[in-house]
Amino acid sequence: MHNIFKGLITALITPFKDNKLDLYALERIVKHQIKHEVDAILIAGSTGESSSLSFEEYKLLLQTSVEIVNKCIPIISGCSSNNTTYARALAAESTKIGVDGFMASPPSYVKPTQHGIYKHFEALHEACNLPIMLYSAPTRSGVDFSDETILRLSKLPRILALKDCGVDLERPLRIRATVKKDFNILTGNDEVVLAFNAQGGVGWTSVASNIVPNICKELLEKWNKNDTKGALEIHQKLLPLYTALFVESNPIPIKYAAHYLGLCENEIRPPLTEASDSAKKQIENIITSLSIKI
């Protein structure tokens, strides 16, 4: 099975207007990613406010994205839930709609054991025939995969990757030494992409690439061509942007940044709130200093 989980994957925001999906803005956002040749887009993940979507909205979001993309780039759907039955329904619907793969985190809040985490993903694996990326986000889930559980899950034929949002930079080295050769490990943290890939990572699921996909793509291309100096120069230039985009809970800052650049409304669903005035100013200043334009 072809592994789509590699390179630059944009964790896409979900645009809203008047408390409904803004499909016109979605088209602008998706076409911006296609224009700059990202390797894939992730729909309805944490950055996409997936927990605020109804099942009908989830379906409409995926269906519209598939139509816009028209097979130009792979689409990965988020299928995280602390209800295994509901997560299976998301995975089954993703398959039906025609996305190219899906990502899921360990069930949040309920604090399953490692065996429970394994059984959850085994159930998702059985629910469809799509490739799967594990999503390690312990600050969101409250639990995480152990290295042993990742190894067990990697033996299931369609579990092909791990998106790691943790802070343990030894982890990709440890995992790389035990899992199958075609199992990919990507970081979900913009600020550590170079360090992570130096330790065995093969890509990057990025928040910043919602607004600077061209620069993120250039960074990764330089890294893959062994132009470490060039990649580091770009990374250092982007560091203030990474900081600004996480000055408040993701996706609050990136939603405002996208709005400031004309991609969408600055509408975010409760219990999240829009960016504070100080956060807005910080975001505006870095966008101006980097001359970011859409």
Curated annotation (Swiss-Prot):
It is an enzyme of class 4 (lyase). Pyruvate binds at residues 47, 205. It is found in: Cytoplasm. The active site is at 135 (proton donor/acceptor), 163 (schiff-base intermediate with substrate). Its main location: cytoplasm. It catalyses: L-aspartate 4-semialdehyde + pyruvate = (2S,4S)-4-hydroxy-2,3,4,5-tetrahydrodipicolinate + H2O + H(+). The keyword Secreted does not apply. One of its GO terms (cellular component) is cytoplasm. GO terms for molecular function: (R,S)-4-hydroxy-2-oxoglutarate aldolase activity; 4-hydroxy-tetrahydrodipicolinate synthase activity. The keyword Cytoplasm applies. Its EC number is 4.3.3.7. SUPFAM superfamilies: Aldolase (SSF51569). SMART domains: DHDPS (SM01130). InterPro entries: Aldolase_TIM, DapA, DapA-like, Schiff_base-form_aldolases_AS, Schiff_base-form_aldolases_CS. GO terms for biological process: diaminopimelate biosynthetic process; glyoxylate catabolic process; lysine biosynthetic process via diaminopimelate. Keywords: Amino-acid biosynthesis, Cytoplasm, Diaminopimelate biosynthesis, Lyase, Lysine biosynthesis, Schiff base. Pfam families: DHDPS. Pathway: Amino-acid biosynthesis; L-lysine biosynthesis via DAP pathway; (S)-tetrahydrodipicolinate from L-aspartate: step 3/4. The record marks 46, 109 as: Part of a proton relay during catalysis. Belongs to the DapA family. Catalyzes the condensation of (S)-aspartate-beta-semialdehyde [(S)-ASA] and pyruvate to 4-hydroxy-tetrahydrodipicolinate (HTPA). Homotetramer; dimer of dimers. This is 4-hydroxy-tetrahydrodipicolinate synthase. The gene is dapA.
